[in-house]
Each structure stands twice: as structure tokens, then as C-alpha cells.
Amino acid sequence: MKGSKEIKLTQMVTASGUAAKIGPEDLAKALVGLPKMFDERLLVGFDTSDDAAVYRLDDDKALIQTLDFFTPMVDDPYLFGQIAASNSLSDVYAMVGKPIVAMNIVCFPSCHDMSILGEILKGGADKVIESGAILVGGHTVDDKEPKYGLSVAGLVHPDKVLANSGARPGDALILTKPIGTGIVSTGMKAAMVQKSTEDEVVKIMAHLNKYAAEALDGFNVNSVTDITGFGFLGHAAEMAKGSGVTLEISSKDIPIMSEAEELAKMGIIPAGMYRNKKFIQSDVLCEGVSEHIMDILYDPQTSGGLLVSVPQEHARALADKMTSCGSLAAKIVGRVLSKEEKSIIVI
């Protein structure tokens, strides 16, 4: 690992990664009074809680705009920078776009060694370079708790935008990364996980969704979203509601990180899981699935994978291509049904 400073970034914050986000119920209350924005050039706004905004520039180009930042979930500054940048870039990939420019968003306590911040920025810059985008500046705030992320702009052809609202009955669902980052990160903070598991979760969180998104080219994909702070079921529910369908999730096919099940059984769970569960569970039908597995499905993810809705007949070929392109999981985890009483059915 890079970053030799002996510092416990995770001990400087009350919540880590995407688990630090405001819960979906409280966020919905805050957003209820905002005016709706209408513009014929705005292809994707916040009406369906999508991953990024998309604005048509001309017949051949649309601008993707997004930002994301959060608190540390690992102690190594360089790795924190990599993970935060990967998470920020993911929203562009979820719209099947190409990131072009990025700007740093930094909150950092000025009483600490600035070389620590330098390592965070270096980790972020390396991921921006890997993405093919250009880092062009940023903004800083002196804050008690460190936070880092990016504002990212990307490009996509207006006719090729994939939102979270296009899933169709008969589609299969593919997930491209294992889940459980919130639970495992909580275990890491308490020094309750093995070193091999720490290395695994860091690798997963730092992995760009670029490679999974590039594999979509040539397939008739209907909908995409990325799995982050509202957990697998939270983002799946947004896709279901936006598309007017029900998603049936096969719990046994969900890829889960090492030690996540054991930690969940012990109750080593971030507060964000409970917020997600409270907000979503009334729209979820659970059929004989154990409580600890459901907790993992509600677990807030940091830099999670893509959830892709694709016609059933193309699903296996797409999953195989994703794997060959470098995806960490690419598992078929469910299917899309016509609208039923609940948005999500877990079997």
C-alpha cells in the first residue's frame, strides 16, 4: 500500500464512505420542496433519482454532470483517494458515458500534516488518469472530518443514454461487483476482519466501473444504475419504480464479500443499513430469506458495481464479456417482472 503515514483516517470520522450519506427518508423530506426543472435539452434530471444529470448539447453530444464525496472508509490516504475517485467516476459509467474532466472536492483539517492530504489527492489523480479524464482543479474547506471526492463531467451520445428507468419485463439483471462493503468496512474499523478480507474489499472499492460499462457496447441494454449509499435494494427499488416494473432478486445468486455474512450475523452493521431498511422495506417482499442476508442487501455500498437490465437472451453473453473485460463479479442476480404490488421481491 502507498501512504506510509501512521494515521487512522477512519478514527477521525463518525461514519465511513457512503454509509455517511443522509438516509433516503430524510433526504426525501429535504427535497420535497424543490421546484421541478423543465428543459427540452435536459434528458435526465432528478425525477427518478438517477445517478447523474444528462443535458443535450447537440444532436451528437450530451453532457453528463455528477459529483460525489464522502468520509474515509480505510486508513491509508492514497487508497482512500482511489476509492473516493472511483466512486465519483462511477455515476458517469452508470449513464454509459465517458468522463472527460474532473475537479477535486476536499474537506480536511488544517491541523493535520498536509502530506496526508497530498496522498489522498495522488490516489484520486491516479484513478482519474486511469479513467482517461483530465483533473483540472478543485475546491477545499478546512473541516474537522476529512472528506474527498470529485465533480465529474462526461460525454455520451444523446441516443445512447441509459437511465435507471428503462428496465422491461423479461429482462435479466446483472450485478458487476460483490456487495457488503458497508458491513466489512464497519468490521475493519473495529479490527474484526482478516487482512485478506481488507485487501479484497479495498480492491473492490477502488475498481473502476469503466470496464463493465465498456462491455455494454454492442448489447441491447435497457437500464443501468450503480449500487452505492442506498444499498443494493435501495437502488434496485429506484430502478423498479422509475421503470414501472417489479424486480425479482435471487438472494442465492448475489455475490457477497468475504466475512460479510459472519459480520452481519454478529450485528456488525453500519447505521446506514438501518436507515435504508426503514425507508425501503415496505416496498420489498421477502420470501424465506434469512435476516442477515437481507441486511447485506440493504447495506450501503461504497463504490459498488453496476446493476444492468438486459434482455434475457443476451444476459449470459454480456456477463461473460464483462468478466473478460475485467469485471469483478458479473453475476445474473434476478429478473424483471411486470408491475406487482411490491417493487422488489427477494427469493
From Swiss-Prot:
Species of provenance: Peptoclostridium acidaminophilum
Superkingdom as given in the UniProt entry: Bacteria
Pfam families, alphabetized: AIRS (PF00586), AIRS_C (PF02769)
Catalytic residues as annotated in Swiss-Prot or TrEMBL: U18
Protein known as: Selenide, water dikinase 2
Function noted in UniProt: Synthesizes selenophosphate from selenide and ATP.
Residues that, per the record, bind Mg(2+): D51, D91, D226
Annotated HAMAP family: SelD (MF_00625)
InterPro entries noted in UniProt: PurM-like_C_dom (IPR010918), PurM-like_C_sf (IPR036676), PurM-like_N (IPR016188), PurM-like_N_sf (IPR036921), SelD_I (IPR023061), SPS/SelD (IPR004536)
SUPFAM superfamilies for this protein: PurM C-terminal domain-like, PurM N-terminal domain-like
Gene: selD2
Subunit structure: Homodimer.
EC number from the UniProt entry: 2.7.9.3
Single GO term (MF): magnesium ion binding
Family: Belongs to the selenophosphate synthase 1 family. Class I subfamily.
Bridged cysteine pairs (disulfide): none
Residues binding ATP: K21, T48, S49, D50, D68, D91, G138, H139, T140
Site (Important for catalytic activity): K21
Reactions catalysed, as given in the entry: hydrogenselenide + ATP + H2O = selenophosphate + AMP + phosphate + 2 H(+)
Cofactor descriptive note: Binds 1 Mg(2+) ion per monomer.
